[in-house]
């Protein structure tokens, strides 16, 4: 097996994104064209590769100076437990070290301890809200 490599890129095929997102059960994988366009419009995207296979990524949305929202940290199930998610987080946090705020909204409570290891804490009176328009 080849060593895992990491790239800062926003260029993915629709099929690469579809496979990755559906592998972790995320419904947004059913919208690969929108995912591809969304990645291009993101602030920072760091991806993990096994050879030419996309196996993980983390995406940040930001205003360039004050706040970044980390969105989409996902790793193929067969590659989980190999510290790939940790490496992706370390790399994106380094890219955003100058920001005043870095925020994340974990969608699964079981992942909260993972983010706490990087210094994230529950945000006081904040409540995550969503308007889901997937059909």
Predicted regions and their residues:
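Conserved acyl-CoA
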Residues: 87-102
